[in-house]
């Protein structure tokens, strides 16, 4: 029915597709003499790829991939497909080769990738591809260290001094609350606070040292870092207290035991009364 309607239509223009004389069904397989097939039957050891696969023509047509978009756009509805996927024109029509159609088909096919350069090896390409696909780590604002002093890029001197760390309000609030309960931190507690506030242990230690010095200054407490000997001499000179007087105390043995006392004895009173060292009740030179 399709062939009759195709031949009746006189206004139909000849289809344009590439030459297919060599793909026709009659010329697809070469014509051989009967002796050629008889010679092949006599040689069973020869390799025959067609004998390995026995398929029906309809099954083979289903297994073949569908025709490409280029063939679909250039052929009419009445064109017959061969089992091999080639286009067969209807009988009675003369086909003319059209170079434009072939050029259009070539443009549809993708171009192969360019070959790698001589200096670049496949190993280097494989090593560079994971680095390019690796994502940069995400850095949040609270993870960045804020510094007050910023060294300019034109600075050519020696190594600049360590910049002062500016703590955020939240960090200062947490540190003040911890200092309110504990003025001295243990190592374990210092590590916990450092992880919580995203600071280093050294920063926590220095902050508590400075905070303790400020607290002592506000409460007017003496500095504990000064030597104890110099502190005692300075306090005696400034206050004007007398030096302690050593008085003997009787003991069980003959040796004398002295105890300090702040009372200074009056020599004139002892001389006038005529008291002797032997009459003094607290002095004993030997056993009784």
Curated annotation (Swiss-Prot):
A cellular component term, taken from the record's GO annotations: nucleoplasm
Molecular function GO labels: DNA-binding transcription factor activity, RNA polymerase II-specific; RNA polymerase II cis-regulatory region sequence-specific DNA binding
Coiled-coil ranges from the UniProt annotation: none
Primary localization: nucleus
Swiss-Prot/TrEMBL GO biological process terms: anterior/posterior pattern specification; embryonic skeletal system morphogenesis; positive regulation of transcription by RNA polymerase II
Biased segments, Polar residues type: 118-132
Cell compartment(s), UniProt: Nucleus
Ranges annotated as DNA-binding: 160-219
Residues spanned by motif Antp-type hexapeptide: 139-144
Keywords: Developmental protein, DNA-binding, Homeobox, Nucleus, Transcription, Transcription regulation
Region (Disordered): 10-136
Described purpose of this protein according to its UniProt entry: Sequence-specific transcription factor which is part of a developmental regulatory system that provides cells with specific positional identities on the anterior-posterior axis.
Family label: Belongs to the Antp homeobox family. Deformed subfamily.
Protein name listed in UniProt: Homeobox protein Hox-B4a
Species of the source: Takifugu rubripes
């Amino acid at each position: 029915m399709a062939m009759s309607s195709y031949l009746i239509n006189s206004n139909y223009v000849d289809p344009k597709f590439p030459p297919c004389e060599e793909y026709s069904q009659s010329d697809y397989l070469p014509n051989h003499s009967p002796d050629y097939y008889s010679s092949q039957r006599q040689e069973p050891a020869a390799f025959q790829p067609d004998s390995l696969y026995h398929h029906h023509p309809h099954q083979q047509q289903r297994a073949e991939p569908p025709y490409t978009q280029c063939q679909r756009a250039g052929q009419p509805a009445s064109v017959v497909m061969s089992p091999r996927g080639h286009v067969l024109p209807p009988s009675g029509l003369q086909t003319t080769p059209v170079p434009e159609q072939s050029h259009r088909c070539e443009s549809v096919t993708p171009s192969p990738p360019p070959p790698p350069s001589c200096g670049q090896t496949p190993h280097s390409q494989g090593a560079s591809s994971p680095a390019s696909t690796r994502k940069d780590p995400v850095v949040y604002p609270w993870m960045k260290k804020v510094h007050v002093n910023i060294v300019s890029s034109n600075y050519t001197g020696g190594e600049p001094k360590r910049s002062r760390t500016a703590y955020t309000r939240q960090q200062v609030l947490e540190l003040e609350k911890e200092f309110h309960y504990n003025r001295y931190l243990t190592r374990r507690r210092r590590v916990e606070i450092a992880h919580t506030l995203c600071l280093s242990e050294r920063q926590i230690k220095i902050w508590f040292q400075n905070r303790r010095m400020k607290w002592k200054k506000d409460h007017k407490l003496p500095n504990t870092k000064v030597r104890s000997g110099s502190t005692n001499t300075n306090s005696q000179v400034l206050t004007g207290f007398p030096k302690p007087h050593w008085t003997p105390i009787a003991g069980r043995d003959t040796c004398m035991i002295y105890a300090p006392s702040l009372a200074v004895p009056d020599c004139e009173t002892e001389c006038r009364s005529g008291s002797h060292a032997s009459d003094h009740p607290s002095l004993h030179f030997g056993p009784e």
